[in-house]
């Protein structure tokens, strides 16, 4: 499959969420590409979300150098001179169209989503585009 990462690519088609994380298509697994995911440094996720009966939805992004061991996106928070590192999860608590920018420089990227609460009438589509900033 040939993918131009500079154009939005659907990595999760519209579907109801479950209460466990379900991974979308892993970016970087394609073969025969002229460019690789790690040749870009920005990932933009375009998320169309319908909350239905859910309390919220959660999205996590994981990175891998080898498509085997994945490491969840994290952020740092300073607290009284101590640097604390936390895994990062994006929580969506209302129906909407969301744009999530993510810095990256990894060979493989996996995006997963789940719902919290009752999944009835929920839906999520995720598109990804890569670029250089």
Task: Tell what function each PLM region has.
Residues 41-47, 101-122:
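Noncatalytic modules at the cell exterior or secretory-pathway interfaces
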Residues 54-59:
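Short coil-to-beta strand junction motifs in C2/discoidin
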Residues 121-133:
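Exposed low-complexity, polar/acidic, P/S/T/G-rich flexible segments that act as propeptides
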Residues 29-41, 51-52, 100-104:
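Extracellular and analogous surface-interaction loops
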Residues 73-90:
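Solvent-exposed serine/threonine-rich low-complexity stretches and specific carbohydrate-binding patches
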Residues 2-39:
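Solvent-exposed, flexible loop/coil segments flanking beta-strands in beta-rich domains
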Residues 6, 67-76:
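Surface-exposed loop/edge segments in extracytoplasmic proteins
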């Amino acid at each position: 499959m040939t993918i131009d990462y500079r154009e939005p690519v659907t990595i999760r088609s519209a579907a109801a969420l479950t209460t466990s994380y379900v991974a979308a298509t892993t970016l970087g697994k394609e073969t025969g590409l002229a460019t690789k995911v790690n040749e870009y440094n920005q990932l933009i996720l375009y998320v169309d979300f319908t909350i239905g009966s859910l309390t919220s939805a959660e999205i996590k992004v994981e990175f891998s150098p080898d498509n085997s061991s994945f490491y969840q996106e994290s952020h740092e928070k300073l607290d009284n001179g101590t640097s604390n590192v936390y895994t990062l999860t994006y929580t969506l608590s209302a129906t909407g169209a969301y744009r999530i920018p993510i810095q990256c420089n990894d060979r493989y990227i996996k995006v997963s989503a789940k719902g919290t609460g009752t999944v009835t009438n929920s839906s999520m589509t995720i598109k990804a585009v890569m670029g250089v900033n």
